[in-house]
């Protein structure tokens, strides 16, 4: 952006998620704050005369009203994300299998009706974020988060998923590509619900694709 002098004055950015703790979104003082990372790793590095105005940066808050309304009347060209071990995008984790979902997960239609919301995080997600971002300290990772939902995801013209081999394993990277390409949508594998989105692109880092061969260590 700086080198090519691309003005982002008319651009909008939506953060996909933020940690939720003690009834509120975490502050940027939290070491794992997504807003802090977005600002320090991206926007603070863009020349001030080129970066988007503050009012065009939308970060999820405990009260999701303003965040959800910010999607109205604005074109979201691309939603850029990744895939977690639990097969989520953002923090759209599989729902807890209890109550009405004890025997069957919610239908794809029911899951796709979800909007930006506060969610309970799957234990696999907690472990993954401790491993990839917290130096292995799982007690640092909040057990809830605010996440962009399928409703907003379907407002994006394209959903782009980078598979770098860091956040999911060799089987998982292949599984969701197979399910999406075959039109198999199952909310137990949330990423597979993108089978019904009109424009999904997976980009793989070959060095991180790995092998599904079985080997004991």
Regions found by a protein language model. Give the residues of each.
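Short, conserved loop/helix-junction motifs that constitute active-site signature segments
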Residues: 2-11, 51, 152-156, 194-198
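Ligand-binding beta-strand-loop-alpha-helix segment within the catalytic cores
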Residues: 4-80, 140
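Short, flexible loop segments at the rims of nucleotide/cofactor-binding pockets, characterized by
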Residues: 57, 136-141, 179-182
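A short secondary-structure junction signal
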Residues: 69, 89-104, 171-175, 214-215
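A glycine-rich beta-strand to alpha-helix segment
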Residues: 74-98
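Class I SAM-dependent methyltransferase SAM-binding "motif I" and its flanking Rossmann-like core
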Residues: 90-142
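ATP/nucleoside-binding phosphotransfer catalytic cores, i.e., glycine-rich phosphate-binding loops
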Residues: 148-217
